Amino acid sequence: MAIKQPKGKTVRRLGVNIYGNPKYDKLLDRKPNGPGKERGARKRGKTSVYGEQLKEKQKFRFAYGISERQFRNLYKKASRMPGVTGDNMISLMEQRLDNTIYRMGFAISRAQARQMVTHAYFFINGKPVNIPSMCVSVNDVITTKNKKGIQNLIRHNMSTSQSARGSWLTIDDEKLSATVNILPVTTDIQPVGNIQNVVEYYSRNA
């Protein structure tokens, strides 16, 4: 489910460019204060621990385009997995098909990747897929629909995309395909926020 919020206001409210588009860096330089916080206005008191946890949760939710229900379920799944819950959460978010397409450099944003998946631009192991939230697995092969318009769009995106490509993927720029070699790990990813705060938020609001 896509999250429909004004991206500029979201970036200003969270104080970080969660979408990766350089125009939001410029926006934060011009307007570093959150929406409604005018220059010279009396500052509010220090944000509570709960407030900080909520803010970090929203950073991840909006960056990956995940609904509250999906994100809570993702936390529950991660908490049942072996290992560190926060690391598991990041890995699960990165395994989402829409994010994988974004990490392949085939889309300039996760929102665009989500739309492309919904329109069934891709195949996994030869089968058409249209569910952005599905998770890829090791040895999955992702290929592109053989339509000139789709492939031209992807090649254009590849030339303009500024996202960091996933080191866990082997990407074939000529064939417009990728293979999942390993599952993504946090050491290969620059998180958009403090995932431990997110874990603490859900552990106290389960």
UniProtKB/Swiss-Prot annotation:
Pfam families: Ribosomal_S4, S4. This is Small ribosomal subunit protein uS4. Residues 95-157 form the S4 RNA-binding domain. Belongs to the universal ribosomal protein uS4 family. One of its GO terms (cellular component) is small ribosomal subunit. One of the primary rRNA binding proteins, it binds directly to 16S rRNA where it nucleates assembly of the body of the 30S subunit. With S5 and S12 plays an important role in translational accuracy. GO terms for molecular function: rRNA binding; structural constituent of ribosome. The keyword Transmembrane does not apply. It comes from the Bacteria. It comes from Treponema denticola (strain ATCC 35405 / DSM 14222 / CIP 103919 / JCM 8153 / KCTC 15104). Part of the 30S ribosomal subunit. Contacts protein S5. The interaction surface between S4 and S5 is involved in control of translational fidelity. Keywords: Ribonucleoprotein, Ribosomal protein, RNA-binding, rRNA-binding. One of its GO terms (biological process) is translation.
